[in-house]
Protein backbone atom coordinates (compact mmCIF):
# COMPACT_ATOMS: atom_id res chain seq x y z
CA UNK A 1 0.00 0.00 0.00
CA UNK A 2 1.38 3.39 -1.02
CA UNK A 3 0.12 5.88 1.55
CA UNK A 4 1.28 8.66 -0.76
CA UNK A 5 -1.14 7.59 -3.48
CA UNK A 6 -4.04 9.84 -4.43
CA UNK A 7 -6.24 6.75 -4.30
CA UNK A 8 -6.11 6.90 -0.50
CA UNK A 9 -8.76 9.63 -0.43
CA UNK A 10 -11.23 7.51 -2.39
CA UNK A 11 -10.46 4.47 -0.23
CA UNK A 12 -11.19 6.49 2.90
CA UNK A 13 -14.52 7.85 1.69
CA UNK A 14 -15.60 4.50 0.25
CA UNK A 15 -14.78 2.44 3.35
CA UNK A 16 -15.32 5.03 6.12
CA UNK A 17 -12.82 3.60 8.66
CA UNK A 18 -13.22 4.53 12.31
CA UNK A 19 -9.43 4.58 12.64
CA UNK A 20 -6.32 4.41 10.49
CA UNK A 21 -3.17 2.84 11.92
CA UNK A 22 -0.23 4.18 9.93
CA UNK A 23 2.49 1.55 10.24
CA UNK A 24 3.84 2.16 6.74
CA UNK A 25 7.50 3.21 6.74
CA UNK A 26 11.03 2.54 5.63
CA UNK A 27 12.60 1.27 8.83
CA UNK A 28 16.16 -0.07 8.55
CA UNK A 29 18.86 2.19 10.00
CA UNK A 30 21.72 0.87 7.84
CA UNK A 31 19.75 1.31 4.61
CA UNK A 32 18.85 4.86 5.63
CA UNK A 33 22.57 5.67 5.78
CA UNK A 34 23.13 4.30 2.27
CA UNK A 35 19.96 5.74 0.74
CA UNK A 36 18.32 8.48 2.85
CA UNK A 37 16.22 9.70 -0.10
CA UNK A 38 13.93 6.66 0.07
CA UNK A 39 13.32 7.31 3.76
CA UNK A 40 12.55 10.98 3.22
CA UNK A 41 10.09 10.05 0.48
CA UNK A 42 8.30 7.28 2.37
CA UNK A 43 8.44 8.59 5.92
CA UNK A 44 7.93 12.31 5.35
CA UNK A 45 6.53 13.12 1.90
CA UNK A 46 4.09 10.19 1.86
CA UNK A 47 2.95 10.97 5.41
CA UNK A 48 2.23 14.53 4.27
CA UNK A 49 0.07 13.13 1.46
CA UNK A 50 -1.75 10.82 3.89
CA UNK A 51 -2.40 13.72 6.25
CA UNK A 52 -3.87 15.85 3.47
CA UNK A 53 -6.25 13.07 2.46
CA UNK A 54 -7.14 12.22 6.04
CA UNK A 55 -7.75 15.88 6.82
CA UNK A 56 -10.50 16.01 4.19
CA UNK A 57 -11.96 12.70 5.31
CA UNK A 58 -12.02 13.66 9.01
CA UNK A 59 -14.03 16.81 8.22
CA UNK A 60 -16.88 14.58 7.06
CA UNK A 61 -16.39 11.80 9.61
CA UNK A 62 -16.01 13.31 13.06
CA UNK A 63 -15.56 10.00 14.92
CA UNK A 64 -12.48 8.82 13.06
CA UNK A 65 -8.85 9.09 14.14
CA UNK A 66 -5.34 8.49 12.82
CA UNK A 67 -2.79 6.62 14.92
CA UNK A 68 0.67 7.37 13.59
CA UNK A 69 3.07 4.61 14.63
CA UNK A 70 6.65 5.76 15.16
CA UNK A 71 9.79 4.62 16.95
CA UNK A 72 11.83 5.30 20.08
CA UNK A 73 14.79 5.84 17.73
CA UNK A 74 13.63 9.48 17.55
CA UNK A 75 15.04 10.01 21.07
CA UNK A 76 18.57 9.04 20.06
CA UNK A 77 20.86 7.24 22.49
CA UNK A 78 19.36 6.71 25.94
CA UNK A 79 22.39 6.34 28.19
CA UNK A 80 20.50 5.76 31.43
CA UNK A 81 17.02 4.52 32.25
CA UNK A 82 14.18 4.49 29.73
CA UNK A 83 12.84 7.09 27.35
CA UNK A 84 9.58 8.79 28.24
CA UNK A 85 7.14 11.01 26.38
CA UNK A 86 8.79 14.24 27.59
CA UNK A 87 12.20 13.31 26.21
CA UNK A 88 13.58 15.68 23.54
CA UNK A 89 13.99 14.31 20.04
CA UNK A 90 17.66 13.70 19.14
CA UNK A 91 17.61 11.39 16.10
CA UNK A 92 21.01 9.90 15.25
CA UNK A 93 20.33 8.40 11.79
CA UNK A 94 18.48 9.45 8.62
CA UNK A 95 15.85 6.83 9.50
CA UNK A 96 15.28 8.28 12.97
CA UNK A 97 15.30 11.82 11.58
CA UNK A 98 12.68 10.94 8.97
CA UNK A 99 10.42 9.43 11.63
CA UNK A 100 10.95 12.40 13.93
CA UNK A 101 9.97 14.73 11.09
CA UNK A 102 6.82 12.73 10.39
CA UNK A 103 5.88 12.81 14.09
CA UNK A 104 6.20 16.59 14.15
CA UNK A 105 4.25 16.87 10.91
CA UNK A 106 1.38 14.80 12.30
CA UNK A 107 1.34 16.85 15.50
CA UNK A 108 1.33 20.09 13.52
CA UNK A 109 -1.80 18.91 11.68
CA UNK A 110 -3.46 18.25 15.04
CA UNK A 111 -2.64 21.77 16.22
CA UNK A 112 -3.23 23.63 12.95
CA UNK A 113 -6.09 21.77 11.27
CA UNK A 114 -7.61 19.91 14.24
CA UNK A 115 -6.88 16.58 12.56
CA UNK A 116 -7.74 13.82 15.08
CA UNK A 117 -4.40 12.05 15.40
CA UNK A 118 -2.29 10.31 18.04
CA UNK A 119 1.45 9.54 17.86
CA UNK A 120 3.00 6.39 19.32
CA UNK A 121 6.70 5.58 19.72
CA UNK A 122 7.56 1.92 20.19
CA UNK A 123 10.72 0.03 21.10
CA UNK A 124 12.28 -2.70 18.94
CA UNK A 125 9.68 -5.15 17.64
CA UNK A 126 10.25 -8.84 16.99
CA UNK A 127 8.00 -11.69 15.94
CA UNK A 128 6.96 -14.11 13.19
CA UNK A 129 7.78 -13.28 9.56
CA UNK A 130 9.81 -10.18 10.43
CA UNK A 131 11.98 -8.82 7.63
CA UNK A 132 15.30 -10.73 7.52
CA UNK A 133 17.36 -7.54 7.68
CA UNK A 134 16.39 -7.17 11.36
CA UNK A 135 18.67 -8.57 14.07
CA UNK A 136 16.72 -11.57 15.41
CA UNK A 137 15.50 -13.03 12.09
CA UNK A 138 18.92 -12.36 10.55
CA UNK A 139 20.70 -14.32 13.28
CA UNK A 140 18.17 -17.18 13.00
CA UNK A 141 18.53 -17.26 9.21
CA UNK A 142 22.32 -17.34 9.41
CA UNK A 143 22.27 -20.13 11.99
CA UNK A 144 20.01 -22.23 9.77
CA UNK A 145 22.18 -21.55 6.72
CA UNK A 146 25.60 -22.11 8.31
CA UNK A 147 26.70 -18.48 8.12
CA UNK A 148 28.58 -16.21 10.49
CA UNK A 149 26.53 -14.13 12.91
CA UNK A 150 27.31 -10.41 12.48
CA UNK A 151 27.28 -8.29 15.63
CA UNK A 152 28.20 -4.61 15.53
CA UNK A 153 30.76 -3.24 17.96
CA UNK A 154 31.27 -5.33 21.09
CA UNK A 155 27.67 -6.53 21.17
CA UNK A 156 26.91 -4.65 24.36
CA UNK A 157 24.34 -2.38 22.73
CA UNK A 158 21.16 -2.92 24.69
CA UNK A 159 17.67 -2.75 23.19
CA UNK A 160 14.21 -2.90 24.66
CA UNK A 161 12.40 -5.73 22.87
CA UNK A 162 8.65 -5.72 22.23
CA UNK A 163 6.76 -8.73 20.88
CA UNK A 164 4.68 -7.70 17.88
CA UNK A 165 1.41 -9.06 19.31
CA UNK A 166 1.92 -7.03 22.50
CA UNK A 167 2.52 -3.96 20.34
CA UNK A 168 -0.76 -4.54 18.50
CA UNK A 169 -2.66 -4.92 21.76
CA UNK A 170 -1.18 -1.64 23.00
CA UNK A 171 -2.23 0.13 19.79
CA UNK A 172 -5.80 -1.11 20.23
CA UNK A 173 -5.85 0.21 23.80
CA UNK A 174 -4.64 3.58 22.60
CA UNK A 175 -7.33 3.57 19.91
CA UNK A 176 -9.98 2.97 22.58
CA UNK A 177 -8.64 5.18 25.38
CA UNK A 178 -5.98 7.48 23.93
CA UNK A 179 -6.35 11.26 23.72
CA UNK A 180 -6.09 13.17 20.46
CA UNK A 181 -2.79 15.03 20.12
CA UNK A 182 -0.98 12.93 22.73
CA UNK A 183 2.27 10.98 22.38
CA UNK A 184 2.42 7.46 23.83
CA UNK A 185 5.55 5.36 24.28
CA UNK A 186 5.07 1.60 23.89
CA UNK A 187 7.65 -0.79 25.31
CA UNK A 188 8.17 -3.99 27.27
CA UNK A 189 10.57 -2.84 30.00
CA UNK A 190 12.71 -5.80 28.90
CA UNK A 191 16.22 -4.93 27.75
CA UNK A 192 18.75 -7.35 26.36
CA UNK A 193 22.23 -6.92 24.87
CA UNK A 194 22.70 -7.93 21.24
CA UNK A 195 25.42 -10.39 22.23
CA UNK A 196 23.12 -12.08 24.77
CA UNK A 197 20.40 -12.45 22.14
CA UNK A 198 22.87 -14.03 19.75
CA UNK A 199 24.21 -16.48 22.35
CA UNK A 200 20.68 -17.38 23.43
CA UNK A 201 19.65 -18.16 19.85
CA UNK A 202 22.77 -20.32 19.39
CA UNK A 203 22.01 -22.21 22.61
CA UNK A 204 18.38 -22.79 21.63
CA UNK A 205 19.32 -23.87 18.12
CA UNK A 206 21.80 -26.47 19.43
CA UNK A 207 18.88 -28.29 21.04
CA UNK A 208 17.11 -28.57 17.68
CA UNK A 209 19.77 -28.92 14.98
CA UNK A 210 23.43 -29.65 14.41
CA UNK A 211 25.15 -26.31 13.91
CA UNK A 212 27.45 -25.80 10.94
CA UNK A 213 31.11 -24.96 11.45
CA UNK A 214 30.60 -21.39 10.19
CA UNK A 215 28.01 -20.57 12.86
CA UNK A 216 30.02 -18.27 15.08
CA UNK A 217 29.78 -14.66 16.19
CA UNK A 218 31.56 -12.14 13.96
CA UNK A 219 32.16 -8.73 15.50
CA UNK A 220 31.91 -5.87 13.01
CA UNK A 221 33.53 -2.51 13.73
Listing of model-derived features with the role each one plays in the protein:
Residues 67-70, 119-127, 153, 185-188, ...:
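Short beta-strand segments
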Residues 1-125, 165, 194:
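N-terminal Rossmann-like NAD(P)+-binding domain of SDR-like oxidoreductases, especially those catalyzing
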Residues 137, 143-221:
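C-terminal substrate-binding subdomain of Rossmann-fold SDR/epimerase-dehydratase oxidoreductases
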Residues 59, 67, 78-80, 114, ...:
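Proline-centered turn/helix-capping motifs that create local helix->coil transitions or kinks
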Residues 4, 128-132, 190:
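Residue-level signature of the cytosolic catalytic core of signaling kinases
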Residues 78, 98, 129, 155-157, ...:
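Gly/Ser/Thr-rich beta-alpha loop segments that engage phosphate groups in nucleotides
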